[in-house]
Amino acid sequence: MFLRLAMTCGALVLALMIGAAQAQSGYPNRVITLVVPYPAGGTADLLCRFAADKAGSNLGQQAVVENRPGGGGGRVGTESVLRASPDGYTLLCAAQLTFSVTHLLFSKASFDTRALEPISVLAAYPLILIGRESLPFDNLADVIAYARANPGKINYGHQGKGQTGHLLGELLMLKGEFRMTEIPYRGSAPAINDLLAGNIDIVPDYLLANKSNIDAGKLKLLATGSRERLKDYPRVATIAETLPGVYADTWMAVAAPPGTPKEITTKVSRAIAHGFQDPELRSRIRALEAEALAGTPDEMRDLIRQSFETWAPVIDAAKIVVE
């Protein structure tokens, strides 16, 4: 009897193992959902939709985007993916801070994004430093010189505590050894509106959302976080030209729930990479002032490490904690 029971249990375990293997080898056989923890619209959302379209096309299965904003830093959508089944049918498409330093910013959070399984970094785009039209400085070097001589006289607005603009402002002050007065907002739009009105001095933000105002002369482009000067603005110095070794960009990436089999993450990564070789798509991504990457899971792990090495010391030095 015991032998029969053991054989029955063994057969059941074997059947489950075979079923799991078949499920992986047959992946995908139903709709894949890319959870985007931000509102619809904007560069981040568009890049995720490009990824869903190309991944679905190359995998032979529909992939859809589901926007689940909320919770500061996209916590609602991110946490939902962390709790999802590791079967490859629910994926996360989010920005770099989500993958690299969320556990530092949200120290009381009930989740840890380091457990996510990397799939692919989609594209990267530089951060920029912009000033009000009447700001009496045209570049970062002059801003730093004045701020060192007049601590706190210059202010900067950002889109919220622990957000990319906040961290860039703190990074500049840390590396440049100067102080600005911080003015937090709830999102980029109100900060930019106050900058356009001349109510604040500087905002760290993204190029795409501000290009029209820069080109119209309503805002000053003071510096870019790119490794080279931007083609459209050859006279504007990079941050690194003033503060050597300081680069600032952000990237969007796709990851899977903890425990998702490597076979699945590799398959999705290859589908995205193949799709992002499309010249028309790469042109559309360039129009967003971004650079298409679409690398491997290991390349994404390396970028997560680099992001952590950039931002963790800033978070620690500035004692940034988001409640």
Model regions and ranges:
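N-terminal (or domain-start) structured segment
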Residues: 23-115, 153, 177-202, 206, ...
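Positively charged n-region of N-terminal signal peptides that target proteins for export
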Residues: 1-5
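Hinge/capping helix and adjacent helix->loop/strand transition within the periplasmic-binding protein
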Residues: 83-89, 104-190, 239, 244, ...
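An extracytoplasmic/periplasmic, membrane-proximal ligand-sensing/linker region
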Residues: 29-31, 174-178, 235, 262-323
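Short secondary-structure boundary segments
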Residues: 95-96, 133, 206-208, 226-227, ...
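Bacterial N-terminal signal peptides
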Residues: 6-19
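Extracytoplasmic/secreted proteins, especially bacterial periplasmic and envelope-associated proteins
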Residues: 46, 50, 54, 76, ...
